[in-house]
């Protein structure tokens, strides 16, 4: 073992010394491979030939500047400015490298010959002749092409293939290659180009005005433009001459004229505008239109050349969130933009941003200017006194090194000679550790004397200024000023005899008699400051006159804002709207509100057209007489003989009026349709409707749905007749698929020209010999169809098998009263159940066949229900009480019974909502149960072009019940159902995995022989179904046909390879297909589709996960033990133990990660960094954007680390963020509500549920507004409030719709981990003035007092000014032995979710309590459309409704609303106890009560984002309500208490003591440790990670009860 270690050590030492040959060979090989790879990579770079003669140093410059190219230097051509000319080729190639090859490119002022030589046929050059130099250059390029071609010809060569396309294009259409127009006026357009367009500008951008550049790029549809130009930082100094040493060129500036030339050459100079170049350097945005701008971004600087790119930006993506594309979208937003411009001062004109306002950007793009400052140098002529001034760039470190050193000189040593000596010494050398080294500052030696003078003057004047500030007195016979002059003369001696003259002329000093004033000038300015100054003085900012049309544009802007909420607002013709308002003299805001109400279906009518075009609106506004012209009629007959064969068409009946869109008086008819025979021999043209439905539907939503249903029947009949007429007109041109649906009989030959699949059609369309078309009811004999002599052909179809539509139209027409359908008052309950939840089983268990009715959509379902109901042998279900929907409507009134107690509609959501409303009305029932599945296949509109608005598809119900346990579906399908349904879906099936899939190579592979299919065969489409039936499969149906059915095994087949829209991840057809089986499902498909992906995901699920969805029903027994004592809490004093670390540990376990958040400077970070906010309409005063500085107060520092934040400083940004997150973030969830009627019903339930029966009517003998009520209100107010009312005379009402806005400085702590990912917004306070509160405060205080006295206090607690002890007394009589459901309704954004409906409910409550009508109306208008003003932050906005957080009714109003909301949704007659406080509620119900879908009702009716929780212990107002066998105890939330101990707003020790006392008051019950175990259970129910916390509860008691010990939780922040 020792030998092995020795050998290993020796080998390692040899390797380290380099003696190991194997390792050495491997290293050499590695080095060789690396070198080869590197050379190969370099060889793949683009190759550029550099033919001009340049020096070796210039060769190195070019190579280092452009490492992207492999440059070959030939040095075979002498030329002027050789380096610059050669670099121009490299610059061109570098720019073209940025552009995708083959994309249309515009070379602005470019060299078209270079592109031809490179074979770039996709480049167009704009080469305007702006001076004679340009003409000469263009001719030179043509000569180079001729020279190249002549060389090829001389050598008998042809143009290479890569150049041929470009040269052919130049020879055939030279204008496509080059034009002599400026880029702004170029007319070239390459029509065949479909990709993005690019542009380059190589040293040509100087000649394009910067203000026109963006528009010119947009006109050419340029996506990105790459540019290169010469520039030098020194141009921003006061120097008139700047050298570009690397390319031996120079800039000369004379005013705005900037000349570029090459040194020591006689070539012509280039002249440009200095201000124009400065714009390209400094500006970031170049506007192209009112929507798009080009944003400049610098890329790189190489050899005095700056490269940048201009990218096209769509600003609508920034402001709107999505890009709106439409026919008239540009017009709409243009109008919005115009209104904005007039409304806001210089809205976008002054928004021009200078990129270089950021110092870091200046240092990056001007690297030579980093740490450099501009220092002035002065000079003056002794003869003429003419002053001169120039500036130089000097290292900032050099300047302060000199100043700091010479400021230490004594007065006698501070001479110009000493300063010059020091400056010269540190410039020439520096001594480091006794060794002389070269100076780090490379300052021009010719400037040292002038710089020394500047340093000396600055230091001398600074010293004198300090002395003058101290000594303002005379010294002997000389004044102070005289002493100063003596000192200066003594310092300079005879070298500068006119120092005084110089100082006076430079205005460095001022002399007035004997008084001397010295002003020390700024020694330097930074390059960044000079750059901004030069730009602002050189560029005139645009000015816009905003005074004209202010009032008109304000109104139009508000109207357009109102219209912008429409879904298709970008397609609304704004110009027509504006002209309409002007012509008709209509207020635009009124017109806009009407349009929004109509288009949003909030006006009591529905417009069915898809687009709000002028034609559609005009049709909707036609009067009834004009609308009836050309309408559809049904001709009836006079019965001349018993047979229908000789019927003739006489008289008219208006079918269009069936929908109720025209009054009864407009009908033209001989008689009512009393039988189907009156359809016989009706002309086909009378039944074919060009207008599918009414344009306008009026009335309640149920009435509109019923009218739409009648119109759908008319449209279906019209479509069927129209198709039959088409078949008769062109029988020979029918394709194979159409032949399967139709039949055509030739009457003369009695032969079917097209044989129908079915027989015995009920009706058809006949063609007479006169080529007239009529509808005929068909009769049959032993020879077939009975015909007339005048008939030529008869056409039938699958739609004419029964009289369905005709019979239903006849029945529904009888039900109309004055053209309006009757709406039943019966209660409608929607039972929403998942597939297989037992809806049919539930119907059979509930139904009483003697008095109830069951309706189903299809015959199979009806027979199945009859079979199951009569399975016991007793016939209960008959044709009278179990019927199909069509049968019930068609044969209405013919049965033995016409009235039923309850109606059960199975799969009711597959029906037209209007049909459901008719069924409820026709059955005369008291309550109707509509069973369905909101996620499965809904009603499908089969008539193309018939309008079925989205809000018509939503059934109107009074109550919703959910069923979320499936008895059919296996566990894997249950997992899929949980993704589609809200709530937890469970199953009872023992089958876990049931689905599989098989990819079939082609449709022909599926046949009964080679591919027998197991179980029920289903398809998605009718075509696939017919294909399978034709191949020999039996019992095949579509998914839509078997909705509601159950099968053990299912084979699902797809033969169609083309995309099918109903096969999608969220398609209801897929849901139905997956949920029909109980054992297995196999999917056979010819293509990959979303269903394959779903099945593959389900196949991968683990059995452990699937076990979670299993429900086992069992019997549970509860052991009950009665206690000896009841009525009082057992008290056990809590021991005072524990430490600070206990509280920290508990907090970290409950809210992990919160204590690690360093959020002390979050507010500062938000103010200093860029922020993007989505703001609704508001007015901002940016003069308030910088808050007034305040003396910082250092608060006490908590020892317990929590998520508490520092107090925020009120300001524009902070207040705006709070307003956006609070007031501007209100949800919009509610459906269509009849506000007044619904509010009245809700208030009825409120009074019935909460108020004592004898006190439900107001006491009219008590005055609400009297001296006593005012005095009671004043007793509760502070002296400051009363003082504000000193000048109020109570004569007139202030503006009740005006509110003030403010924020709370301290953010509210949340007991979750959201602080780790979001910036918590402050709570907003919106409040009235004290004058308004003085009027309505006493009034609502009295109303509140009367209401609370009327509440049934034995069952309900309205938590207003109640103590924890009173809460314990209220819940103290709960019987813990009685099983209870404890419910909590959690509502987010409670205040901001309240809308017009909530206001209507609250006002109705106050009205019934006795609120006077006038004051009630004033208060109502003051809460409708309100104006908010934040004077501190400079914000003004308008809000509709919403609860005002600082209102006199804020607390009691919120309490009343939450109570009314729960009363409308829950059975309050069963409640045991209920408590309400603001948005908090706690309800105790008996175990097992059925509750509706609270979330659904809260969303649609109350606009609340609500969740209903079932708890073991209640949580109310930050307290845990622990009920036990002796009563009830209320514990303050210990986690909330610990969170407060991390407060960072405690000012001083006195404030801390007040804080401790307030905590002691609320946490007093923690002193009783008898129920700590129940408290642990309650906390763990809310916070899953909370450990048992008795140790921390005792620690809290210990610190809260000891004043001195409590101080140890904080330390002094000022130390």
Curated annotation (Swiss-Prot):
A ribonucleoside 5'-triphosphate binds at residues 833-840. The keyword Nucleotidyltransferase applies. One of its GO terms (molecular function) is RNA-directed RNA polymerase activity. Keywords: ATP-binding, Helicase, Host-virus interaction, Hydrolase, Inhibition of host innate immune response by virus, Nucleotide-binding, Nucleotidyltransferase, RNA-directed RNA polymerase, Suppressor of RNA silencing, Transferase, Viral immunoevasion, Viral RNA replication. Residues 1380-1493 form the RdRp catalytic domain. It catalyses: RNA(n) + a ribonucleoside 5'-triphosphate = RNA(n+1) + diphosphate; ATP + H2O = ADP + phosphate + H(+). Residues 964-1116 form the (+)RNA virus helicase C-terminal domain. GO terms for biological process: DNA-templated transcription; mRNA modification; RNA processing; symbiont-mediated suppression of host innate immune response; viral RNA genome replication. Residues 801-963 form the (+)RNA virus helicase ATP-binding domain. InterPro entries: (+)RNA_virus_helicase_core_dom, Alphavirus-like_MT_dom, DNA/RNA_pol_sf, P-loop_NTPase, RNA-dep_RNA_pol_alsuvir, RNA-dir_pol_PSvirus, Virgaviridae_RdRp. Its EC number is 2.1.1.-, 2.7.7.-, 2.7.7.48, 3.6.4.13. CDD domains: Virgaviridae_RdRp. SUPFAM superfamilies: DNA/RNA polymerases, P-loop containing nucleoside triphosphate hydrolases. Transmembrane segments: none annotated. It comes from the Viruses. Residues 72-281 form the Alphavirus-like MT domain. Belongs to the ssRNA positive-strand viruses RNA-directed RNA polymerase family. This protein is translated as a fusion protein by episodic readthrough of a termination codon. When readthrough of the terminator codon TGA occurs between the codons for Gln-1116 and Gln-1118, this results in the addition of the RdRp region to the replicase. Heterodimer of a large and a small subunit. This is Replicase large subunit. It comes from Tomato brown rugose fruit virus (isolate TOBRFV/Tomato/Jordan/Tom1-Jo/2015) (ToBRFV).
């Amino acid at each position: 073992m020792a030998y092995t270690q020795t050998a290993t050590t020796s080998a390692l030492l040899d390797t380290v010394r380099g003696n190991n040959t194997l390792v050495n060979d491997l290293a050499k090989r590695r080095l060789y491979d690396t070198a080869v790879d590197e050379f190969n990579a370099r060889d793949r770079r683009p190759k550029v030939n550099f033919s001009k003669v340049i020096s070796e140093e210039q060769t190195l410059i070019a190579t280092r500047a452009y490492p992207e190219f492999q440059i070959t230097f030939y040095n075979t051509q002498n030329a002027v400015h050789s380096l610059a000319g050669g670099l121009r080729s490299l610059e061109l190639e570098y720019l073209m490298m940025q552009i995708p090859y083959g994309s249309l490119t515009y070379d602005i002022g470019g060299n078209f010959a270079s592109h031809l030589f490179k074979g770039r046929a996709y480049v167009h050059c704009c080469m305007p002749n702006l001076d004679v130099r340009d003409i000469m250059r263009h001719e030179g390029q043509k000569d180079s092409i001729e020279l190249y071609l002549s060389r090829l010809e001389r050598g008998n060569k042809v143009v290479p293939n890569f150049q041929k396309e470009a040269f052919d294009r130049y020879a055939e259409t030279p204008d496509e290659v080059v034009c002599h127009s400026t880029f702004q006026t170029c007319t070239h357009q390459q029509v065949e180009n479909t990709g993005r367009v690019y542009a380059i500008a190589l040293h040509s951008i100087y000649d394009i005005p910067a203000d026109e550049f963006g528009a010119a790029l947009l006109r050419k549809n340029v996506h990105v433009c790459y540019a290169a130009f010469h520039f030098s930082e020194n141009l921003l100094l006061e120097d008139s001459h700047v050298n570009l040493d690397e390319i031996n060129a120079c800039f000369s500036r004379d005013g705005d004229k900037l000349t570029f030339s090459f040194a020591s050459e006689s070539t012509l100079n280039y002249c440009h505008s200095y201000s124009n170049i400065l714009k390209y350097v400094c500006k970031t945005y170049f506007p192209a239109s009112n929507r798009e701008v080009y944003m400049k971004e610098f890329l790189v600087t190489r050899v005095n050349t700056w490269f940048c790119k201009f990218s096209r930006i769509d600003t609508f993506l920034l402001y709107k969130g999505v890009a709106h594309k439409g026919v008239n979208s540009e017009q709409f937003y243009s109008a919005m933009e115009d209104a904005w411009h007039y409304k806001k001062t210089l809205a976008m004109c002054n928004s021009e941003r200078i990129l270089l306002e950021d110092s870091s950007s200046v240092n990056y793009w001007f690297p030579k200017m980093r740490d450099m400052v501009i220092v002035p140098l002065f000079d003056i002529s002794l003869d003429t006194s003419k002053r001169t001034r120039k500036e130089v760039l000097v290292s900032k470190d050099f300047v302060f090194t000199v100043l700091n050193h010479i400021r230490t000189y004594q007065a006698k040593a501070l001479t110009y000679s000493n300063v010059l000596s020091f400056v010269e010494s540190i410039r020439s050398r520096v001594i480091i550790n006794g060794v002389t080294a070269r100076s780090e500052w490379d300052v021009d030696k010719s400037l040292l004397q002038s710089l020394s003078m500047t340093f000396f003057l600055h230091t001398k004047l600074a010293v004198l200024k300090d002395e003058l500030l101290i000594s303002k007195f005379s010294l002997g016979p000389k004044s102070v000023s005289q002493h100063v002059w003596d000192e200066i003369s003594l310092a300079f001696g005879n070298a500068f005899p006119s120092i005084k003259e110089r100082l006076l002329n430079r205005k460095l000093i001022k002399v007035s008699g004997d008084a001397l004033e010295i002003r020390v000038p700024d020694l330097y300015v930074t390059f960044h400051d000079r750059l901004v100054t030069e730009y602002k003085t050189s560029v005139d900012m645009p000015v816009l006159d905003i005074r004209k049309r202010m009032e008109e544009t304000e109104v139009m802007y508000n109207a357009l804002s109102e219209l912008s909420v429409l879904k298709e607002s970008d397609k609304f013709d704004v110009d027509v709207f504006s002209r309409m308002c002007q012509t008709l003299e209509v207020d635009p805001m009124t017109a806009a509100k009407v349009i929004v109400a109509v288009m949003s279906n909030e006006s009591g009518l529905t417009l069915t057209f898809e687009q709000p075009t002028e034609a559609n609106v005009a049709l909707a506004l036609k009067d009834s007489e004009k609308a009836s012209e050309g309408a559809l009629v049904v001709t009836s007959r006079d019965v001349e003989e018993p047979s229908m064969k000789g019927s003739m068409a006489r008289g008219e009946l208006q079918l269009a009026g069936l929908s109720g869109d025209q009054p009864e008086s407009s009908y033209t008819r001989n008689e009512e349709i009393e039988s189907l025979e009156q359809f016989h021999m009706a002309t086909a043209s009378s039944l074919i409707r060009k207008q599918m439905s009414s344009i306008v539907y009026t009335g309640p939503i149920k009435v509109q749905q019923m009218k739409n249903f009648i119109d759908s029947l008319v449209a279906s009949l019209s479509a069927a007749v129209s198709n039959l007429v088409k078949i008769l007109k062109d029988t020979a041109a029918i394709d194979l698929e159409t032949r399967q649906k139709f039949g055509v009989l030739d009457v003369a030959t009695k032969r079917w020209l097209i044989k129908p699949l079915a027989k015995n059609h009920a009706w058809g369309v006949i063609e007479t010999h006169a080529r007239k078309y009529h509808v005929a009811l068909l009769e049959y004999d032993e020879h077939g169809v009975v015909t007339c002599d005048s008939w030529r052909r008869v056409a039938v179809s699958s739609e004419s098998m029964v009289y369905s539509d005709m019979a239903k139209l006849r029945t529904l027409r009888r039900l109309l009263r004055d053209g309006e359908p009757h709406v039943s008052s019966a209660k409608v309950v929607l039972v929403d159940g998942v597939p297989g939840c037992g809806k049919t089983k539930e119907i059979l268990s509930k139904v009483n066949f003697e008095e109830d009715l069951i309706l189903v959509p299809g015959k199979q379902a009806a027979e199945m229900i009859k079979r199951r109901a009569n399975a016991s042998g007793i016939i209960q279900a008959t044709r009278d009480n179990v019927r199909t929907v069509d049968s019930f409507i068609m044969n209405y009134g013919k049965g033995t019974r016409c009235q039923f107690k309850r109606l059960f509609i199975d799969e009711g959501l597959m029906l037209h909502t209007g049909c459901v409303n008719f069924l409820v009305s026709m059955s005369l029932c008291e309550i109707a149960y509509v069973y369905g599945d909101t996620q499965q296949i809904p009603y499908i509109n089969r008539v193309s072009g018939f309008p079925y608005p989205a809000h018509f598809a939503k059934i109107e119900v009074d109550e919703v019940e959910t069923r979320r346990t499936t008895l059919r579906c296996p566990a894997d399908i249950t997992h899929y159902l949980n993704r589609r349904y809200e709530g937890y879906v469970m199953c009872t099936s023992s089958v876990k995995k049931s689905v599989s899939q098989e990819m079939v190579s082609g449709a022909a592979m599926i046949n009964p022989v080679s591919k027998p299919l197991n179980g029920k065969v289903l398809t998605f489409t009718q075509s696939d179904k017919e294909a399978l039936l034709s191949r020999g499969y039996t019992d095949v149906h579509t998914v839509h046909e078997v909705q509601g059915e159950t099968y053990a095994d299912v084979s699902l087949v797809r033969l169609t390879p083309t995309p099918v829209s109903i096969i999608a991840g969220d398609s209801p057809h897929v849901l139905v297909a997956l949920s029909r089986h109980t054992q297995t499902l196999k999917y056979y498909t010819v293509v990959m589709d979303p269903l394959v992906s779903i099945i593959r995901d389900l196949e991968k699920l683990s059995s452990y996960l699937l076990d979670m969805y299993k429900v086992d029903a069992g019997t549970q027994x509860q052991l009950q033990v009665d206690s000896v004592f009841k009525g009082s809490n057992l008290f056990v004093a809590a021991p005072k133990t524990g430490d600070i670390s206990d509280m920290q540990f508990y907090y970290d376990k409950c809210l992990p990660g919160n204590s690690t958040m360093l959020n002390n400077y979050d507010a500062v970070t938000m103010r200093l960094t860029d922020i993007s906010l989505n703001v609704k309409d508001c007015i901002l005063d940016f003069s308030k954007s910088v808050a007034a500085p305040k003396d910082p107060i250092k608060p006490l520092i908590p020892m317990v680390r929590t998520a508490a934040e520092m107090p925020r400083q009120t300001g524009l940004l902070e207040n705006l963020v709070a307003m956006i997150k609070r007031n501007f973030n209100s949800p919009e969830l509610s459906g269509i509500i009849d506000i007044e009627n619904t509010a009245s019903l809700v208030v009825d339930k409120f009074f019935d549920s909460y108020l004592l029966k004898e006190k439900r009517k107001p006491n009219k003998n008590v005055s609400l507004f009297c001296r006593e009520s005012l005095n009671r209100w004043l007793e509760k107010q502070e002296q400051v409030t009363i003082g504000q009312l000193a000048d109020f005379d109570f004569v007139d009402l202030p503006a009740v719709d005006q509110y003030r806005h403010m924020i709370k400085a301290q953010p509210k702590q949340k007991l979750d981990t959201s602080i780790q990912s979001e910036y918590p917004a402050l709570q907003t306070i919106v409040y009235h003035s004290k004058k308004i509160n003085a009027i309505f405060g006493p009034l609502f205080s009295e109303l509140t007092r009367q209401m609370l006295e009327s509440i049934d206090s034995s069952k309900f607690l309205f938590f207003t000014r109640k103590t924890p002890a009173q809460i314990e007394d209220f819940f103290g009589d709960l019987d813990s032995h009685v099983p209870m459901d404890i419910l909590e309704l959690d509502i987010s954004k409670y205040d901001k979710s309240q809308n017009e409906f909530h206001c209507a409910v609250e006002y109705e409550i106050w009205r019934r309590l006795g609120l006077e009508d006038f004051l009630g109306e004033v208060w109502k208008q003051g809460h409708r459309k309100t104006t908010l003003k934040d004077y501190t932050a400079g914000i003004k906005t308008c809000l509709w409704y919403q609860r005002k957080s600082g209102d006199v009714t804020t607390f009691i109003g919120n309490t009343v609303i939450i109570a009314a909301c729960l009363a409308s949704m829950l059975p309050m007659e069963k409640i045991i106890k209920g408590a309400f406080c603001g948005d908090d509620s706690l309800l105790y119900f008996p175990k097992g009560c059925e509750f509706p879908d609270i979330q659904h009702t809260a969303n649609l009716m109350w606009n609340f984002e609500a969740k209903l929780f079932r708890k073991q212990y209640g949580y109310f107002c930050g307290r845990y309500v622990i009920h036990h066998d002796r009563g009830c105890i209320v514990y303050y939330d210990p986690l909330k208490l610990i969170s407060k101990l991390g407060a960072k707003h405690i000012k001083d020790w006195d404030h801390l003591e007040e804080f401790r006392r307030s905590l002691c008051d609320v946490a007093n019950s923690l002193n009783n440790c008898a129920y700590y175990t129940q408290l642990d259970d309650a906390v763990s129910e809310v916070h899953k990670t909370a450990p048992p916390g008795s140790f921390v509860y005792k620690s809290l008691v210990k610190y809260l009860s000891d004043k001195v010990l409590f101080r140890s939780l904080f330390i002094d922040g000022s130390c």
